[in-house]
């Protein structure tokens, strides 16, 4: 019988980690994460280590989005979260946050609380999971990971290779009792999780015109209709 694995993704951490993935491949532009492939790559890594079958039963993504009163057009972000749900099979938990006029300002506390609450909920549910894969190596997650291990669950944090002279406690991997497997660094898997886009012909949702595109999301709008769609969103 295969082990059940759930993936818990800190969306803010993953977004900020893209620069490291760019550098790993020697590129500054053109890198995108294959979100559909990402959970499976990490589960396969665990399966190879244990020499056991590992079944991915659920992928949970936690993130934030500027609130309506912040005055930012968030249509693109909502489309991204919809893409994760419809095309990648993710379960998303997204919180509206007042960014105070600064789109780059982030409040990680929402994401951390949501992720750890969900992790402990499933850890306490009999038969829900055997292994929790946590994408994000924030040391603030350590108490929740310790608690999940008390329920008999095995934990696999996924982080980035530490910078030179970094303090051990700046990452989950430097803390005791939070990991049941060798460290997994996302930058080591950069080539594996890189999205390779295929050119295909799609029909515009507004005008019905066919156009070649690499967009794989649920709704497609041609070059002429794209601006109209964004202005109406």
Explain the meaning of each model-derived region.
Residues 1-108, 161:
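Domain-level signal for Mg2+-assisted phosphodiester chemistry and nucleotide/NA-binding surfaces
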Residues 10, 228-233:
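Extended, helix-rich structural scaffolds rather than catalytic motifs
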Residues 82-230:
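Nuclease catalytic cores that cleave nucleic-acid phosphodiester bonds
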């Amino acid at each position: 019988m295969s082990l059940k694995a759930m993936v818990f993704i800190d969306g803010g951490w993953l977004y900020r980690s893209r620069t490291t993935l760019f550098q790993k491949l020697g590129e500054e532009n053109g890198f995108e994460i294959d979100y559909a492939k990402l959970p499976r790559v990490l589960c396969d890594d665990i399966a190879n280590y244990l020499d056991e079958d590992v079944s991915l039963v659920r992928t949970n993504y936690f993130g934030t989005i500027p609130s309506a009163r912040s005055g930012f057009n968030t249509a693109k972000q909502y489309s991204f979260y919809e893409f994760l749900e419809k095309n990648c099979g993710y379960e998303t938990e997204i919180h509206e946050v007042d960014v105070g006029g600064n789109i780059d300002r982030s409040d990680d506390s929402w994401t951390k609380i949501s992720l750890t609450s969900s992790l402990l909920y499933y850890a306490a549910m009999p038969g829900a999971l055997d292994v929790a894969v946590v994408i994000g190596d924030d040391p603030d997650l350590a108490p929740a990971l310790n608690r999940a291990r008390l329920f008999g669950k095995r934990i696999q944090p996924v982080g980035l290779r530490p910078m030179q002279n970094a303090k051990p406690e700046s990452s989950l991997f430097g803390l005791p009792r939070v990991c049941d497997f060798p460290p997994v660094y996302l930058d080591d898997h950069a080539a594996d999780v890189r999205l390779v886009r295929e050119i295909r012909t799609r029909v515009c949702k507004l005008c019905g015109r066919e156009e070649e595109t690499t967009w794989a999301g649920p709704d497609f709008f041609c070059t002429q209709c794209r601006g109209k769609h964004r202005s109406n969103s």
